[in-house]
Structures are given as C-alpha cells and as structure tokens.
Amino acid sequence: SMYKMGREKSIYNKLIKEKLPATGKKLAIVGAGPAGLAAAFWLSRLGHEVTVYDASSEAGGILRWGIPAYRLPKDVLKKEIALISKLGVRFVFNTAMESKEQWQRLVDANDAVIVAVGAWHETGLGIPGEEVSGVLPAGEFLKAASQNQKPKVGSEVVVVGGGNSAIDAARSALRLGANVQIVYRRARTDMPANAEELSGALEEGISVLCMTQPVEVVAKEKGGKKTVAGLKVQRMKAGPVDSSGRPTPVPTQDIYEIPCDSVIVAIGEKVRVPGLEELGVSKEKDGRIKADQFSFLTSHPKVFACGDAVMGPATAAEAMGQARSVAEYLDEYITGEKRFQKLFRSFDYKMEVPTKLTKAKMTKAIFIPVDARKSNFMEISLGYTGEQARIEADRCLRCDVRETKRRTYSAPLEE
C-alpha cells in the first residue's frame, strides 16, 4: 500500500533521520534473506555498523529467488533492500562461508556475528529413477523462473509435496503453459501450505492428488539419454497419529502410473552451514544451529543465529519476526543498555477491550480474475481499497502495545 500510494520516500527519509547515534560496534550478518535483512534493518537503525554477506549475487534470499513475482513483485523487494542500504548497511555478495577460517576471521573482525542463512539444501525423493533428466528440485526451478530464464518443463508436470514451495512451483509451472498435478502423501487438511495459496491453485485448475506417494520415476530413452515418462505412485491410507499430530500415511497395494514429462520435487529443505562446528557452535542432528530460544545466542559467545538456521524451513514472516527479537537482545548484549524502544514513539493508550462487541468477518482483498492471471506472473492480489482497509481496521479489539510490565488479555476472535 505504501508503494502504491507513493509514500515510501517520506517514510524512508523519516527512518534515516531517526537513526540512533553511531555506537562504534561492528556486526556481521551471514545471509541476506528475510531474517538477515530484517536483522540488518533494526541493527542499523540502532546505530551499529552492519555488513551482510551472502553467497548469491543479490539480496533477498527466498524473497528474491523462491517466492514468485505473482506473490511478491520484485520491484517492491528492491525498494525495501534499497532502504536498508540507505540506512548504512553494506552488502558483500558472491561470498559463501564454508570454512572455519572464514568464520574465525568474521568473528575476530566484529563485535558479534548473526548466522541467518536459509534452508537451501533440498531433500530428494529417494526412489528409483529420480536421477533422470526432467526431475527438478523446486528451489532450482523457482530460482530459474525468478530470473526470467523460463525453466525447461514439459507440458505435463507433476509436483511432489504439500508445502508452500510445492504450491509456488505448481502455480509457476502452470504460468509457463503446463498442465499441473500436485501429489501429496497425506490428506489435504494436513498440507502445511498456506490455505489461501492452496485455494488459489485449485481455482486456477491445478489438481491435487492426496494420500498418494511416489515410488518410482518412469524413464524413457530420448536422444541418447533417459528422460521422464511418468511417475509411478502408491495410494496411502491413514494410520496412527504420529509426532506431528497427523495420521501416518500407510501404503496400500494400489499402485499406478501418472503420465508426465517433468517432475518437480518440493518435499523439504535442510540447513547446511559448514565450518561453524569447528568454531565451537553446536548444531542439531539435522544441521540446524542450536541457539537459546530467548536470546538466540549460540554456544559461541559472539555468534547468534535466527531464521531457517535455527527453525529449519519456515515462513518469511516467522524469520523476520525472530530477527527483530535477535536485534533487540543483541543490542542490549553489546551495549549494556535497553535501547530498542527508542526506535518507537511513546503514547498513552487505554488498555481496555470495548464493552460492546459486534461480529465482523475478515475483509478479503481483491484478486485478479483467474483467467486474467494464470498465464502470466503479474501480481494477483490488488490489496484493499481505502474503504476495505477502514472496515478491517475497525475489527481490531486493541493494539499490540508493548509495556514494561506485560499484561495478559483475552478476547473473542473472529475468522
């Protein structure tokens, strides 16, 4: 909304003007994705000298390379990154941290280091035939699409997975002219994907085959090499509830083949941060960094971690929220003062829930019609009109106000 109204310059100038005085503290952030960018934003406003390192050629991480333009226009992202640069943050690209020596130099040169790398190491299917031409990791496919390279996919695409990456890959393949099916081994209600994104995919004509698990990529010879000819799948049934709180998928004897010429794999990603353990930073068995749940300090006294590096694959919003918490604690850790609230205006607020409450459903944003959007990557959500925004604001029962003494309130919530 800020960009559509052309208000960003005045807001940028205000944020730059209200930066706290320089502290003389130097901080390094590894990873220029949602967590790294958010941490850099807050810490630079607090007066610290911040340098962000990233293995890619541009900042943004999953926002730049993974989330399609129809969800997040790249010009908006570029403006956000430009603001962070104007706040004084320095970016160093094409720099991967892969050895103890690199990490040691970073720790020695800074007052603290934040590890904010994303979960980019993709999980394979572990089935026969997945090495043939035409089987693509979702991250690789989405990155190519984000660079307008038009990834090589056939006319019949099967996407394996039930998360947001799977939905993004399916809707992107559709926009590239393919007929798309999603295969997921659990029930639709168990899909971790955002409900609105899944609904959008179904509206656009993408079919979802649930309780279905891949067992083999069927190949054919073409031009002297093996390519995808189909995906052999197995029907599943619901078993006992597992540790995730969902029924365990149990294989049945029903196995059949889905004809296709491309398979996009989106079944999960892992964090890979080589060299840190040799520096004394402890990790979980799956590669995530062990960090205190409140301070986000690791087992090394100068190394913090946040985002995917700690949580594993998470939403951009979760990573950015965690980065704000890290920035607040880190600032106090290196300055010895509680200064974070100086970034916000103080005001009086009567912390009371209105005595008269009326039910009001959530206002839905305006979306471009299906036929006008499914063949291109233009932004599909037009957001709220001014009147819709006012109505939605009126639904609030109280503001999320920070207090020195935290108080707990409860109030009925509407969908």
Set out the residue ranges of the language-model regions:
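Beta1-alpha1 glycine-rich phosphate/pyrophosphate-binding loop at the start
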Residues: 25-97, 123, 140, 168-218, ...
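Feature captures the FAD/FMN-dependent oxidoreductase FAD-binding
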Residues: 21, 26-30, 78-127, 216-232, ...
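Glycine-rich Rossmann-fold phosphate-binding loop(s) that bind the pyrophosphate
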Residues: 30-35, 161-163, 308
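Ferredoxin-type iron-sulfur electron-transfer modules in oxidoreductases and energy-metabolism complexes
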Residues: 1-19, 145, 373-391, 408, ...
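A conserved FAD-binding loop/helix module that cradles the flavin
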Residues: 169, 306-340
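Glycine-rich dinucleotide-binding loop and its adjacent helix/turn
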Residues: 3-21, 79-99, 122-176, 284-294, ...
